[in-house]
Design a protein with these regions (language model features):
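NAD(P)-dependent Rossmann-like dehydrogenase/reductase catalytic/cofactor-binding core
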Residues: 87, 94-98, 123-133, 139-250
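Conserved hydrophobic helix-helix packing surfaces used for dimerization/oligomerization
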Residues: 47, 252-253
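Rossmann-like NAD(P)(H) cofactor-binding subdomain of soluble oxidoreductases
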Residues: 1-44, 60
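General beta-strand structural signal in soluble alpha/beta enzymes
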Residues: 26-31, 71-75, 196-198
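Internal alpha-helical scaffold of NAD(P)-dependent oxidoreductase catalytic cores
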Residues: 16-24, 44-131
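Conserved N-terminal Rossmann-fold NAD(P)-binding element of oxidoreductases
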Residues: 256-257
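Short beta-strand segments
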Residues: 1, 28-31, 48-50, 93, ...
């Protein structure tokens, strides 16, 4: 099992495999909110089978689908893989907020705005927005940023409590994937000119450039933003077109901002 983004090539795991085996290789990415501790106890779980060949994704879907595991298909392999890497960084941020004794409001804000960062980067790289709003995106993010099983959340909590990164990692006792994902995430953000303030602050904390408290202040004191990427006039115009064509009343068209 492997996931993440290689920091030198910035390839996802499937892209590395394809680079070795060639374009004829049929590669499936499995991802979603599936902590092993619950899967082995046959607790109902859901996952995504992603392949650019839908028939292959469906074959894997049929292999894994049973009464305790529901499998959905997706053709956005890169998007699914990016979700699996980036959500660990946001989980670190959520853990840091927990270690600072902040509450549910703060964690909800980090999850929501963290998802916005993930989506911005992914769509700029050609991934599907729906992928980030599905099981591999928000689904896995919620689990990783809230669960007691999450190594990333636990490591973040320790950092928020004052541990340095090395000691926090040793205390967790396993690989903390969010730490490994940070270099590639920062490089991708720079390459595609995408603003990722939460990711950048986690990176600064890990590198010892700012304290967790300083990072919180920096995030809260950023320039004021709108939650929408489209202007109110554009949204109103689109809604009026939808209304006139369908005659079904106003349907809101909303997209995520920075």
């Amino acid at each position: 099992l492997a996931k993440g983004v290689e920091k030198d090539s910035l390839y996802t795991m499937s892209e590395i495999i394809r680079d070795v085996l060639g374009n004829q290789a049929k590669i499936v990415a499995l991802s979603g909110p599936t902590h092993a501790e619950e899967v082995v106890r046959d607790m109902p779980s859901t996952i995504v089978s992603a392949c650019d060949d839908l028939e292959v994704a469906e074959k894997v879907q049929n292999l894994f689908q049973d009464t305790c595991m529901r499998v959905y298909t997706n053709i956005d392999v890169r998007g699914v893989e990016l979700c699996g890497a980036l959500k660990n960084i946001i989980a670190l941020a959520a853990g840091i907020s927990h270690g600072l004794n902040y509450g549910d409001n703060t964690r909800a804000a980090l999850i929501t705005r963290g998802l916005s960062e993930m989506t911005r980067l992914g769509t700029t790289m050609g991934c599907l927005e729906q992928t980030f709003h599905g099981l591999a995106g928000i689904g896995d993010l919620i689990v990783t940023a809230t669960s007691v099983h999450s190594r990333n959340f636990k490591c973040g909590t320790l950092i928020g409590q004052g541990y340095n990164v090395d000691d926090a990692t040793k205390e967790v006792g396993m690989v903390v994937e969010g730490l490994n994902a940070l270099p590639a995430a920062m490089q991708l953000a720079k390459r595609y000119d995408v603003e990722m303030p939460i990711t950048a602050m986690v990176d600064a904390i890990v590198k010892g450039k700012v304290s967790p408290n300083e990072a919180v202040k920096a995030l809260m004191n950023r320039d004021r933003k709108t939650e929408l990427t489209k202007s109110v006039a554009d949204i109103s115009f689109e809604n009026s077109i939808i209304k006139s064509k369908r005659g079904l009343g106003m349907k809101r068209v909303i997209t995520y901002g920075t």
